[in-house]
């Protein structure tokens, strides 16, 4: 179950340096400090402006997933899929991100298990939950998700996490295509191209992004290089800034997108560069936390268990499952979204079939909860969200930025209580006069307690998936992003007794010098801005003896610390292995060199150019400015 393991660290010596010790083959010149942000992809291309195209956005969420579609000839008519298998005719903007496998008791060996997903489960049935989080081995899991139980369920059916995600996305894909066929007809669908835009968390690792794309490709959504990917807060920003018009945001202002989901809350800050057309740049590295609305459900469950007593509560869940589900659904659909302590002094949770108990607070099939009791469920989770947002605000203000808005989206983003808490938390200062827009200088003079407008769009729960289809329609709104980590490669260099230990040196028979390996060249700095329009160049010099393979490998390495080391250490993260085939380069571009001992070898100077988009990266091989092919990357 390698998908449940911790992040794989690099071996003590990278493959590139193992080759370097045999014959010195590389030297990396310094390059501009830029950034990296996703899986291997072709250079970014916006969708071609052609007619007869359907764009489908898929918001693959931790607890719920959603799908939206739009026809390019009618761009204002974004449709949300609301009917799902097992939904019993009840419409829902999203479907649970849950899946299970089943085999008949007498099934022969090799029988393919049947799949249940989404709304197809009875309350007591076992299923895989939060499988998305297992794609990123650096992500923490909520307390209610057991890695051991998940691993056991997968192992029983010889499945991996990627298999489960792919199987779930396959069900989403098949239902989406069936729904679109009913909507538009078979002949229309047969002649119309369908492009998919997939969302991912802001804090997703490069490995997780690449694996998510692989799962989507296996599900039938297209080739990895053709599936567009956009971060969830970015998609929410695309939709919200267009939906909330007019708003008070001006060029130069920063706003924070707070995407509150079921399991996680993700935040990204953006600075407005232009309003028409709308262009923004990422102004702070994305952050996130395990403080989604599912934690409210579990706090509610603990509250009910405490009130009823463990024995009576467990008996209700096992023998009166529908009673518990009705109470939980009421909490989910009404209390979580609409609770307001100023208006709701008493909440009555339906638990039909439970006997009256004045001491417990059970009356006529209802459990009576005071506003203070409900607030006690909300407050610890909401405080975590406020602290996350405050961290983004503090970081922006420390750099002299104006923070003018917080955009609240996602399922948890619908919560009236969360909206009011954020509003009171960030609008304690009196707003500036309406008639006079403050300059940056005067706004900064207000201090750290300047009011920040909190905005909540009408369709907060589907803001991400609506933004995904808008991205497919209109292309990239974000012109630059921030690096989550330092990224670089290791290299060998000439031994310098003032810098290096004698124990580190080795003799290079080709360069005929003492060398040291495992030096780090950090091409990309943590927190640096990058643009998909500006490739990042890695320069190399490599030597080849006669008959030596021209297929070379390099390790792409990352560092999460604020200050990266000058030499390779075991705690650096191995991102991927880059494989470059130099056979396409004309032999005339190689330089023939000879050592003093008469040993001939070929030398080649070449460049790897990295192109970054919203959730991916691609590499090209260039020699003297001429492109000679794509570089493959294997994420570890």
What are these regions (language model features)?
Residues 6, 29, 42-43, 356-371, ...:
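Acidic low-complexity intrinsically disordered segments
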Residues 45-78, 124-126, 242-282, 487, ...:
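Gly/Thr-rich phosphate-binding beta-strand-loop-beta motif of the actin/hexokinase/Hsp70
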Residues 14, 23, 73-217, 292-343:
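Phosphate-binding loop and its immediate beta->loop->alpha context
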Residues 2, 28-53, 223-258, 276, ...:
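Conserved phosphate-binding catalytic cores of ATP/NTP-utilizing and phosphoryl-transfer enzymes
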Residues 135, 153-160, 188, 201-203, ...:
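Gly/charged contiguous loops adjacent to phosphate- or pyrophosphate-bearing nucleotide/cofactor binding elements
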Residues 94-104, 126, 272-318, 362-386, ...:
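Glycine-rich phosphate-binding loop plus the immediately following alpha-helix
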Residues 98, 227-246, 297-302, 380-383, ...:
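Glycine-rich phosphate-binding/hydrolytic loop that grips phosphoryl groups
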Residues 167-187, 235-246, 251, 375-403, ...:
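Phosphate/ATP-binding catalytic cores across multiple sugar-kinase/actin-like superfamilies
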């Amino acid at each position: 179950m390698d998908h449940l393991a911790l992040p794989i660290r690099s071996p003590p010596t990278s493959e590139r340096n193992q080759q370097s010790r045999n014959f010195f083959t590389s030297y990396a010149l310094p390059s501009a400090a830029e950034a990296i942000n996703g899986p291997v992809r072709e250079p970014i291309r916006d969708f071609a402006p052609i007619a007869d195209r359907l764009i489908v956005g898929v918001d693959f969420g931790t607890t719920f997933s959603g799908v939206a579609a739009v026809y390019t000839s009618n761009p204002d008519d974004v449709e949300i899929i609301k009917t799902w298998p097992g939904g019993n005719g009840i419409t829902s903007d999203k479907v649970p991100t849950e899946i299970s496998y089943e085999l008949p008791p007498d099934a022969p060996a090799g029988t393919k298990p049947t799949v249940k997903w989404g709304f197809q489960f009875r309350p007591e049935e076992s299923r895989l939950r939060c499988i998305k989080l297992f794609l990123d081995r650096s992500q923490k899991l909520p307390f209610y998700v057991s890695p051991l139980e998940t691993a056991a369920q997968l192992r029983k059916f010889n499945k991996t996490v990627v298999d489960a995600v792919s199987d779930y996305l396959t069900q989403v894909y098949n239902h989406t295509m069936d729904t679109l066929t009913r909507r538009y007809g078979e002949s229309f669908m047969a002649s119309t191209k369908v492009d998919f835009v997939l969302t991912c968390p802001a804090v997703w690792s490069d490995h997780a992004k690449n694996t998510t794309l692989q799962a989507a490709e296996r599900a039938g959504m297209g080739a990895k290089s053709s599936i567009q990917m956009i971060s969830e807060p970015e998609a929410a920003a695309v939709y919200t800034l267009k939906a909330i018009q007019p708003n008070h945001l001006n060029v130069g202002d920063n706003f924070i997108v707070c995407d509150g989901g079921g399991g996680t809350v993700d935040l990204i800050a953006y600075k407005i560069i232009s309003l028409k057309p709308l262009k923004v740049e990422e102004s702070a590295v994305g952050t996130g936390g395990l403080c989604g609305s599912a934690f409210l459900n579990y706090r509610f469950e603990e509250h009910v268990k405490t009130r009823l007593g463990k024995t009576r509560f467990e008996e209700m869940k096992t023998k009166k499952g529908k009673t518990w589900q009705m109470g939980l659904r009421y909490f989910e659909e009404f209390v979580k979204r609409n609770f307001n302590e100023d208006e709701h002094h008493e909440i009555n949770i339906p638990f039909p079939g439970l006997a009256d108990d004045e001491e417990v607070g059970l009356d006529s099939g209802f459990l009576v909860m005071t506003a203070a009791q409900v607030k006690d469920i909300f407050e610890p989770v909401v405080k975590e969200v406020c602290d996350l947002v405050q961290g983004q605000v503090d970081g922006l203000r420390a750099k002299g930025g104006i923070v003018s808005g917080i955009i609240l989206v996602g399922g948890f983003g619908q919560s009236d209580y969360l909206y009011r808490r954020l509003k009171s938390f960030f609008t304690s200062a009196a707003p500036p006069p309406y008639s006079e827009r403050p300059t940056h200088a005067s706004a900064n003079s207000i201090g750290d307690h300047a009011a920040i407008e909190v905005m909540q769009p009408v369709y907060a729960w589907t803001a991400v998936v609506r933004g995904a289809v808008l991205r497919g329609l209109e292309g990239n709104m974000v012109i630059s992003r921030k690096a989550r980590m330092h990224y670089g490669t290791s290299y060998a260099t000439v031994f310098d007794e003032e810098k290096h230990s004698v124990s580190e040196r080795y003799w290079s028979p080709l360069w005929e010098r003492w060398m040291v390996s495992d030096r780090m060249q950090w091409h990309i700095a943590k927190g640096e801005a990058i643009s998909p329009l500006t490739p990042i160049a890695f320069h190399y010099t490599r030597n080849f003896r006669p008959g030596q393979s021209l297929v070379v490998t390099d390790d792409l390495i990352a560092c999460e610390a604020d200050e990266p080391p000058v030499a390779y250490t075991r705690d650096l993260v191995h991102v991927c292995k880059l494989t470059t085939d130099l056979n396409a380069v004309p032999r005339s571009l190689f330089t023939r060199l000879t050592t003093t001992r008469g040993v001939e070898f070929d030398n080649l100077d070449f460049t790897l150019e990295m192109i970054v988009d919203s959730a991916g990266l691609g590499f090209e091989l260039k020699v003297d400015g001429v492109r000679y092919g794509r570089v493959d990357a294997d994420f570890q």
